[in-house]
């Protein structure tokens, strides 16, 4: 874990990571739309990445402004002192080894330093393992349940939770 570093990603790093995601997913058009959404909202988001020996292995995005053009279900999820966390990703071979937890702690500390007092996130009800992790991290205040819609027309049910920091 000594070679693992957490940081705020540059635009170059964000592009590199999106190109990696595009390369490993079959539905290229959907992932191209996710990339476009991310890049057009950079002024409203902070992207955090975990690097292990020059490889991006974890990432998470904090949406910090309600001006974000693509965030869905914004009501009660984002505000002046409230950030919405999304796009939690860990490369498969590094899951369950504590890397994402370290990135999450780095991100929470940074957002608190920036004046945020609460964080929100969304999780599908079927993602039991993730729900347990988020509860352990303090995301135990239920906010609401809504559908999120993907660019390809699919929809998924999402429960939203909040944590005070």
Briefly describe each language-model feature range.
Residues 1-16, 20, 165:
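Conserved N-terminal entry element of GNAT/NAT acetyltransferase domains
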Residues 24-53:
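Active-site rim helix/loop that mediates acceptor-substrate recognition in acyltransferases
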Residues 39-50, 58-59, 67-68, 84:
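A short helix-loop-beta-strand connector motif used in the catalytic cores of GNAT acetyltransferases and
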Residues 60-87, 148-153:
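Conserved acyl-donor/pantetheine-binding loop and adjacent beta-alpha core of acyl/acetyltransferases
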Residues 90, 96-109, 136:
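Conserved acetyl-CoA-binding loop-helix of GNAT-fold acetyltransferases
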Residues 111-122:
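Conserved GNAT acetyl-CoA-binding A-motif
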Residues 121-131, 147-153:
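Conserved beta-strand-loop-alpha-helix junction that forms the acyl-donor binding cleft
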Residues 134-144:
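Conserved acetyl-CoA-binding loop of GNAT-fold acetyltransferases
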């Amino acid at each position: 874990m000594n070679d693992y570093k957490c940081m705020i990603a540059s635009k170059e790093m964000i592009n590199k990571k999106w190109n990696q995601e595009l390369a490993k997913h079959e539905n290229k058009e959907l992932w191209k739309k996710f990339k476009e959404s991310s890049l057009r909202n950079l002024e409203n988001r902070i992207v955090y990445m975990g690097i292990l020996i020059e490889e991006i292995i974890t990432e998470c995005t904090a949406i910090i402004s309600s001006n974000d053009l693509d965030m869905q279900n914004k009501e009660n999820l984002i505000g002046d002192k409230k950030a919405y966390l999304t796009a939690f990703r860990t490369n498969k071979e590094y899951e369950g080894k504590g890397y994402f937890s370290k990135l999450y702690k780095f991100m929470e500390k940074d957002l608190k330093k920036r004046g945020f007092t609460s964080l929100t996130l969304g999780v599908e009800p079927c993602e039991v393992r993730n729900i347990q992790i988020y509860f352990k991290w303090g995301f135990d205040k239920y906010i609401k349940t809504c559908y999120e819609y993907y660019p390809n027309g699919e929809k998924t049910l999402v429960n939203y939770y909040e944590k005070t920091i």
